[in-house]
Amino acid sequence: MSTKNPSEMPRILVLHGPNLNLLGTREPQHYGADTLDAINARLVARAAASGVACDTFQSNAEYRLIERIHDARTDGTGFIVINPAAFTHTSVALRDALAAVDLPFVEVHLSNVYKREPFRHHSYFSDLAVGVICGLGARGYDHALEHALDTLTAS
């Protein structure tokens, strides 16, 4: 565990979009049995073990996610992991917020969106993301976090 002052640590922001607060109970055949709290606790602990702060935030409201992305410009965030959930296919505003802050990010989806309904095949974020992880369940967040840690600790 790092002994750095948390305000001096590099920061990763993990954003969760709409309905992800229901993880563990909502359509487990698509999204798995892990709760959002369990996922967040695992990510925060893993980041801390590498001397990196990890903030997590979930909202069902698009504007709250946008405001949190805007805050990342000035709060020391160096990397974003985002699961935009249903906003993946609809939100130009979230895309514009990510483009405006100009921070590297990985897009995560619990399910394989390409094995689901055709409307889920389009993402407004993928072309801006440094990477996209889908279909690996909650472990997709772990892989995204490892990439973020590698990126932040290499610089």
UniProtKB/Swiss-Prot annotation:
Recorded metabolic or biological pathway in which this protein acts: Metabolic intermediate biosynthesis; chorismate biosynthesis; chorismate from D-erythrose 4-phosphate and phosphoenolpyruvate: step 3/7
GO molecular function, one term: 3-dehydroquinate dehydratase activity
UniProt keyword Amino-acid biosynthesis present: yes
UniProt keyword annotations, A-Z: Amino-acid biosynthesis, Aromatic amino acid biosynthesis, Lyase
Active site: Y31, H109
GO biological process: one example: quinate catabolic process
Binding-site residues for substrate, renumbered to this chain: N83, H89, D96, L110, S111, R120
Protein name, entry field: 3-dehydroquinate dehydratase
